[in-house]
Each structure stands twice: as structure tokens, then as C-alpha cells.
Amino acid sequence: MKVLALNSSPRSAGESKTELMLNHLVKGMREAGADVEIVHLRKKKINHCIGCFTCWTKTPGLCLHKDDMTNELYPKWRESDLVIYASPLYHFTVNAEMKAFIERTLPSIQPFFEDCKDHTTHPLRFKHPSIVLLSVAGFPE
């Protein structure tokens, strides 16, 4: 199984509880035979989605931004069987780095809607990887 583990914590090793928890998860996955690559989003240049929909109209499936997301991360995401989104909990959700990554996967869906039983959705351009969310809150409760 090919796994891409995305760590969106802005903190480095030793300070990041997200990274600590992710490392334990990855260790177990590797012991079980998974091929896991960890990517620290804080070290990557990911421009924000600007909602231009070029990836749907002018260049279907391709974002107009030329950055680490387009050139490296999106292809790895597409080729993975499983992707781990590891993020600290900031203001009730994933942090801005992870949100930017997720928004930049917009080229992976098509611009029209289709009915799927009890809901309406955008059809996928290709089979998406399975997603696991590892959300970490550093406050003791």
C-alpha cells in the first residue's frame, strides 16, 4: 500500500504534537508493510486556490499555479492508495496549510453535478485515494 502522510503542523519536531502522533501512526503502518512517505507542508510552497476554475475550464485537471502543489504534491496525492491529513486543530478545523492543500485538489473533480442516490456531487476525474484525518489538539482537557 502506498501512503502519503501530510503533516501540516507549523511546528518542528520536538514541539509538534501532530508530528509526534503522526510518527507513531507511520511507524505502525511501516511495520505492517506499508510504503509511507511523510511530507511536511511547512517546508512546501502551496499557493492558495483563487477560485478561477481554470482547472475545470481552460486546462481541465490542471491548476494554473506553478508551485510545489502542482509540481510535486498533487501527483503524489493522485498516485497514493491512502493519504493521511495530519493537522493541529485551529479554530474548530484543520489549519490554513492543510486547508490550502485540500482546496488545491479541486482539479480532481469535474465541473458539473450528478445525482448519487440521496445527494448531488461532482463526479471524480479519477479514483481518489482513501483519506484518514489525524487531528491533534494540544490543550489538556
Q: Predicted regions: what is each one?
A:
Residues 110-141:
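Short, glycine-/small-residue-rich phosphate/pyrophosphate-handling segment
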